[in-house]
């Protein structure tokens, strides 16, 4: 994945841009939700999913409050706060507990009463292979 060509998706509703690998496929039904997109790669039992979406902030949470709330909801084991954004990562959990071998990485960017979110879900054994995507998410600027 290190050398693959990256494509850009520009959201028509919110005008943000997401970069994704050329061999990922866009899920067409992801376009039905305003401000959302989903790209995925599936081979044998390996699935890597990159998503972006916009979420309202009805409680007007400040960055620290939102980071604490989402970290708790997602069972994040790592948190990092930046200027106008925060990043969470950890193992993916279902209602029944931790999913074996699956991880997530997510960046939340605050803009007024909205959260712009980009996530990556991947098998733990693919951590090195998805480093470039994690770097893309780290560098993601909404505008």
Where do the protein language model's features map onto the residues?
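Short amphipathic alpha-helical segments
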Residues: 58-66, 129-132
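Surface-exposed amphipathic alpha-helical segments
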Residues: 22-26, 115-143
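Signature of long, low-cysteine stretches enriched in small and polar/charged residues
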Residues: 63-121
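Residues that act as N-cap/strand-start positions at coil-to-secondary-structure junctions
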Residues: 3, 12, 33-35, 72-73, ...
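Short, hydrophobic/aromatic-rich segments at coil-to-beta transitions
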Residues: 2-8, 36-38, 81-91
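Hydrophobic beta-strand residues in large extracellular and virion-surface proteins
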Residues: 9, 18, 39-41, 49-54, ...
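Secretory pathway targeting signatures of secreted, lumenal, and periplasmic proteins
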Residues: 12-62, 93-97
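Sec/Tat-exported extracytoplasmic proteins
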Residues: 28, 71-74, 141
